[in-house]
Amino acid sequence: MEFLVRQENNMPQMSAEEAARIKSAEREYAQQLRERGILRRLCRVPGTRTAVGWYEAGDVTELHDVLSGLPTFQWQAITVEALATHPQEKLLAAAKSSTTATA
């Protein structure tokens, strides 16, 4: 299943060292999620502390487990939307498939 996840980071004030440690752990965890094929894309919302991610997970429980593993989870306001394939995507996939088959 694919999900659009909006994550608003509300990390409190803390020492620079502690903030750097948490941010480093967050980057490392995100890289692991990318390597596992769970985190597909991650974008910023300009002018905010919000990120929007495209995640793939087997089900909502797996996604919850992934998100709750984020080092900043306790400070995030998260909204999740399940995604369905748009008919245009199906047409594009079919067109690519037929082009590859004839090449």
What are these regions (language model features)?
Residues 1-103:
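Conserved, structured core segments of small domains
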